[in-house]
Amino acid sequence: MSDQFDAKAFLKTVTSQPGVYRMYDAGGTVIYVGKAKDLKKRLSSYFRSNLASRKTEALVAQIQQIDVTVTHTETEALLLEHNYIKLYQPRYNVLLRDDKSYPFIFLSGDTHPRLAMHRGAKHAKGEYFGPFPNGYAVRETLALLQKIFPIRQCENSVYRNRSRPCLQYQIGRCLGPCVEGLVSEEEYAQQVEYVRLFLSGKDDQVLTQLISRMETASQNLEFEEAARIRDQIQAVRRVTEKQFVSNTGDDLDVIGVAFDAGMACVHVLFIRQGKVLGSRSYFPKVPGGTELSEVVETFVGQFYLQGSQMRTLPGEILLDFNLSDKTLLADSLSELAGRKINVQTKPRGDRARYLKLARTNAATALTSKLSQQSTVHQRLTALASVLKLPEVKRMECFDISHTMGEQTVASCVVFDANGPLRAEYRRYNITGIRPGDDYAAMNQVLRRRYGKAIDDSKIPDVILIDGGKGQLAQAKNVFAELDVSWDKNHPLLLGVAKGADRKAGLETLFFEPEGEGFSLPPDSPALHVIQHIRDESHDHAIGGHRKKRAKVKNTSSLETIEGVGPKRRQMLLKYMGGLQGLRNASVEEIAKVPGISQGLAEKIFWSLKH
């Protein structure tokens, strides 16, 4: 396996959805295309110690990059895999020269037609559906058809010599035309017609006919037959899942966008004649502070109005973003193409699902890109370089949360070389300060955290103070006054302040509470780890504050009632299902709680009411 391809890091980013994957060598050539019901499971199998074959070993040894395209159904993945193989001709895929070598599904012309896989010349009388990319795809489809439309798949030699139905009939996978009287000629012919329509991509017609038959059976009080047809309808719907292979012959590009950590991904899904031909993710360079709208508008303009891209303009473009110059863009594209080009940002129905697919792929590709480019270790290495430290093995970050100065909670989160160390996260209830005094709260939590003995392995290399210069000054004062046995000068104190509009990527960092701070580029791995730990600390503080506020809300009303101590409060809330249930209870209901007398129940009742 290539030293440059980090399979472990890549697999952490892969989804378990169905889709298609493309493997590239050092020259950027696609060397293998595959599909999977579960992308994560399938791709993981390539990086086991005991590979299945020498071919797989040779393939894996050349992998430099893997791209994935998520699909909503396995059928989509199959179609997309076929298109990619035809497009790239990867040397590790089985490449067949002409359609004679491709397998087909064969529907025979017998009195009772059968389904089978067929290769080679088409001499036998019947209908051929395909070609399919490989035998596995045909066998998979035949197994599916057998569950929904139970027509026979046995050889004629078996069919002609049966006196009683086989196991396939017993388990509902065949109607048993081999034995007279088990199925009528009309019913069998109807199921064959359903198969014919289904394999022709006309599943809507199949559903329409089945629904009509179900309604007729129901009106005739044939409820058992109606239930059987209902089950068949549900099976067809489950399989088709309203696949993104349009019968209307859509000719369009679908553009999904994802934006995170200063990086944008624009994923374009190419659809021609209603078929998904393929897709590609683009990662435009994004200057710091750029709005997402500018990223999208600039990309779309460059993509279609420059170079040779205009030669492949579709009839319609679906966008995941509402452009301010949508009309101008559409007019420009129409003029270049010499025909009407529509730009749509709020599609409905199937087209909205196309857009959802592009959006999903954009998010997946961006997650993978960010992870591959900046793992936690890489980010910490980058941070150490920025801070001029030999290494950063441990970071701690503090944040304060309160509501109008009440129920103040401070949080401390810890990162080590592998990222968040959640077992060591801590919350501190802040008391004895003036309401809303965040400086005093920060002073208190730092003294409680560091004013004691600390094991050498737990001394942080960096302490991040969320809040800017004022909070950093408090931290500096606390550490100057600490009288501890461990090296209090080892941790580097770093203040971080959000930009004026509090946008991620515009943070200012401070080494000292005086003077100017400095900023890092929005795509800097060092900034990403700072944002990560700061956001973790913020979420941890808010979570603790909400719990504290909820606890106060539930208990404060009871704490003022004489004779109701902690144990009785707990018992009352437990039996009544919370404070609201207790407020709605009668005196008699309250008196039934263990440990609550009639007199105390009346006191509780009137205290809560008044």
Swiss-Prot record:
It is found in: Cytoplasm. GO terms for molecular function: DNA binding; excinuclease ABC activity. Its main location: cytoplasm. Keywords: Cytoplasm, DNA damage, DNA excision, DNA repair, Excision nuclease, SOS response. GO terms for biological process: nucleotide-excision repair; SOS response. Gene3D superfamilies: 5' to 3' exonuclease, C-terminal subdomain (1.10.150.20), GIY-YIG endonuclease (3.40.1440.10), UVR domain (4.10.860.10), UvrC, RNAse H endonuclease domain (3.30.420.340). GO terms for cellular component: cytoplasm; excinuclease repair complex. Residues 16-94 form the GIY-YIG domain. Residues 204-239 form the UVR domain. The keyword Membrane does not apply. The keyword DNA damage applies. The UvrABC repair system catalyzes the recognition and processing of DNA lesions. UvrC both incises the 5' and 3' sides of the lesion. The N-terminal half is responsible for the 3' incision and the C-terminal half is responsible for the 5' incision. Interacts with UvrB in an incision complex. This is UvrABC system protein C.
